[in-house]
């Protein structure tokens, strides 16, 4: 295994590794780099879904929909509940312990599309921004039809480090209210305007230190509804100011997909965006969420 750094100075590129055969020590190194550098890229892989989760499981506990599906199966669902249950079953790759999500418009053998199969951009976001139990890592694997599509990432550790000492002090005690509803849309214009799952009970700090001791900004600006203690107008002005700081090119990594690519990213101190893609009915990514439970820091 060889480790290089991308030309942007922070994204990690791992070469000369077959993740099917990766050992615990290699997983330890890769997991640690995800936490410290926020994005790790590994190319030229040929993995089954089970091999994907096997590697992710070397880094931490892999998220599964088993309990949620089992609870739904025990419940007398109304029509809306049945529709949601069927939708969730459709986004999951079969025979993977309900842990691998298909990101695609391609239909499964029962005619159900995967997650986020729309062609329009899926604008800047992170995993489960409104939930305290959120997994801190997202794995994306290019299964097929990925060429010509692009996903970009932001590193908020670097963005935080570039702040003045005065702004670091100002931001230290700021808390945010977050939420998201996919029914509201995916673009910057509408991403944060649907409101049925805003979480006012959990208000995370804007400045966050992750499990590796790296400090950055937890600031999912398109999933952010308000800043605690500010009115709507002041919140909007503040969010736009910080957003514009984060959207500087020097904090970004752009990935132009090829089949067999893996991108692993940390979800506290990073955001990602899928750009417009007209071939979502052919493009299939696998998405796995997990934590750092097996990594020693």
Stretches with model-predicted labels:
Residues 2-264, 268-297:
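Fe(II)/2-oxoglutarate oxygenase catalytic core
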């Amino acid at each position: 295994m060889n480790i290089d750094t991308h030309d942007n100075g922070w994204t990690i590129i791992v070469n000369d590794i077959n993740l099917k055969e990766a050992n615990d020590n290699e997983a330890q190194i890769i997991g640690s780099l995800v936490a410290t550098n926020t994005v790790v890229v590994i190319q030229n892989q040929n993995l089954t879904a089970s091999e994907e989760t096997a590697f992710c499981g070397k880094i931490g506990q892999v998220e599964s929909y088993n309990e949620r599906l089992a609870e739904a199966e025990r419940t007398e669902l109304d029509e809306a509940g049945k529709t949601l249950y069927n939708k969730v079953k459709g986004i999951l790759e079969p025979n993977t312990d309900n842990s691998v999500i298909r990101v695609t418009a391609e239909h499964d053998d029962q005619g159900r599309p995967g997650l986020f199969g729309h062609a329009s951009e899926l604008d800047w976001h992170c995993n489960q921004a409104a939930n305290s139990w959120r997994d801190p890592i997202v794995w994306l694997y290019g299964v097929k039809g990925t060429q010509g599509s692009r996903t970009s990432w932001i590193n908020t550790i670097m963005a935080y480090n570039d702040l003045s000492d005065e702004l670091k002090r100002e931001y230290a005690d700021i808390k945010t209210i977050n939420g998201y509803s996919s029914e509201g849309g995916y673009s910057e214009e509408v991403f944060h305007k649907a409101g049925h799952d805003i979480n006012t009970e959990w208000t995370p700090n804007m400045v966050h230190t992750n499990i590796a001791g790296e400090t950055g900004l937890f600031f999912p600006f398109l999933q952010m509804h308000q800043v605690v203690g500010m009115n709507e107008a002041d919140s909007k002005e503040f969010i736009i100011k910080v957003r514009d700081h984060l959207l500087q090119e020097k904090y970004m990594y752009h990935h132009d997909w090829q089949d067999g690519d893996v991108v692993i990213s940390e979800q506290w101190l990073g955001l990602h965006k899928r750009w417009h893609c007209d071939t979502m009915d052919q493009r299939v990514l696998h998405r796995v969420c997990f934590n750092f439970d097996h990594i020693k820091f």
